[in-house]
Amino acid sequence: MQGFISQVLGPVVDVDFNDYLPQINEAIVVNFESEGKKHKLVLEVAAHLGDNRVRTIAMDMTDGLVRGLKAEALGAPISVPVGEKVLGRIFNVTGDLIDEGEEISFDKKWAIHRDPPAFEDQSTKSEIFETGIKVVDLLAPYAKGGKVGLFGGAGVGKTVIIMELIHNVAFKHSGYSVFAGVGERTREGNDLYNEMKESNVLDKVALCYGQMNEPPGARNRIALTGLTMAEYFRDEMGLDVLMFIDNIFRFSQSGSEMSALLGRIPSAVGYQPTLASEMGKFQERITSTKKGSITSVQAVYVPADDLTDPAPATVFAHLDATTVLNRAIAEKGIYPAVDPLDSTSRMLDPNIIGEEHYKVARGVQSVLQKYKDLQDIIAILGMDELSEEDKLVVERARKIEKFLSQPFFVAEVFTGSPGKYISLEDTIAGFKGILEGKYDHLPENAFYMVGNIDEAIAKADKLKG
């Protein structure tokens, strides 16, 4: 099924066929030479222009393409490698290895455009996905097969939390993770790869990168490449997979560029008219089935901190939980710097998590909120002017704040403290004890950077001794 290139407009390429019309999303391959080098360019059909002419989006730079070059339609969408062989390697949007490691052949490949699981195959049970991170499990628990938004500025610890989650899934749930770098900096991708290598989690994760410098087609479709690899682990191997998308905003942004290049009339703020349906199509594939689940953590960049911007607003509609990182908390030296009052989860419901967990979580939030309200009085008049009751609230709040910190496995190199995975039962028991006043006699420093409450008691004895 050969055609030829009739027009090249940046990343948009028109291809003519004589007696064949490729379907939308079908892949077309162009092999050509430019500056003495051989190139293989993959195009994806985006529109039919009539008379067997199709308009395609290029998955790589179109430098060196000329009219009249032969193009071959593959009769199927872009297909990428799947299975255990993909672990520990880096792929681009078309499923080629880009980590300069040894070349291996993949026996299994899946198309990146797939339907979401049928309704009867989906699991409707609401289950908590235990992460081993106290602040997350207690106050904004993740749903198995749910979607989590990770909000935070530069340098507050998004990547460290992502790596800790990958570590805990690998070692505690013996599960796999997939990381899709969607339109982010190449340097960050490189750093992540090296850090994963150092913290021994690389062999449990597959990495797919479509970086900032690539054409919009590659940046948009890389999310589907990563998702397809995760779907294989869920559907064929029956695993609970963790899928990271950094950054989901770039998925919408590249979609808007593609839409403009294809000549579609833009909608609000210049975004593509199909923004909601594209996002819905993608997010619907991330779900739990009766065989396994894909739990996704999506970093969300909010342009100009405007939460009403159509791109982040469309993402919000799909999220089950939000983990908000706060610079003020990081400045206090409390890591992970998760904001206990701003982070939310639909799982925080007594019918799902049980009465005890719900009461402890709400109790913790209420004490922290009271402490926040008293900050101004403390700043102006000092602690001595508070009533005895308020003094107690402040003391407990400071202990809770410190106890929400914990040493991470992936940060052992920097902190020198061994990482801790805290079970949900231990987390609830610890905070319940603080709220009930069982540990009012312990110094607040005993609660800083420890795992469960027993470690805090042991640390207090050490501090006394």
Curated annotation (Swiss-Prot):
Binding residue positions for ATP? G152, G153, A154, G155, V156, G157, K158, T159
Identify which top EC class this enzyme belongs to.
Answer: translocase
Return the EC number.
Answer: 7.1.2.2
- Protein's cellular compartments: Cell inner membrane
GO CC list? plasma membrane; proton-transporting ATP synthase complex
**What are the coiled-coil residue ranges?**
none
Q: Which domain of life is it from?
A: Bacteria
As its record notes, the protein acts as a catalyst of: ATP + H2O + 4 H(+)(in) = ADP + phosphate + 5 H(+)(out)
This protein's major location comes to membrane
* Membrane topology, as annotated: Peripheral membrane protein
PROSITE patterns noted in UniProt: ATPASE_ALPHA_BETA
Q: Name one Pfam family in it.
A: ATP-synt_ab_N
The keyword Ubl conjugation belongs to this UniProt entry's keyword annotation? no
What keyword terms does UniProt attach to this protein? ATP synthesis, ATP-binding, Cell inner membrane, Cell membrane, CF(1), Hydrogen ion transport, Ion transport, Membrane, Nucleotide-binding, Translocase, Transport
**What GO MF terms are annotated?**
ATP binding; ATP hydrolysis activity; proton-transporting ATP synthase activity, rotational mechanism
Report the PANTHER family cross-referenced here.
ATP SYNTHASE, ATP SYNTHASE SUBUNIT BETA, MITOCHONDRIAL
The record's HAMAP family line, in alphabetical order, gives: ATP_synth_beta_bact
Q: What does this protein do?
A: Produces ATP from ADP in the presence of a proton gradient across the membrane. The catalytic sites are hosted primarily by the beta subunits.
Q: Which family does it belong to?
A: Belongs to the ATPase alpha/beta chains family.
| Subunit structure of this chain's protein | F-type ATPases have 2 components, CF(1) - the catalytic core - and CF(0) - the membrane proton channel. CF(1) has five subunits: alpha(3), beta(3), gamma(1), delta(1), epsilon(1). CF(0) has three main subunits: a(1), b(2) and c(9-12). The alpha and beta chains form an alternating ring which encloses part of the gamma chain. CF(1) is attached to CF(0) by a central stalk formed by the gamma and epsilon chains, while a peripheral stalk is formed by the delta and b chains.
Q: What is this protein called?
A: ATP synthase subunit beta
Organism from which the protein derives: Campylobacter jejuni subsp. jejuni serotype O:2 (strain ATCC 700819 / NCTC 11168)
User: Coding gene?
Assistant: atpD
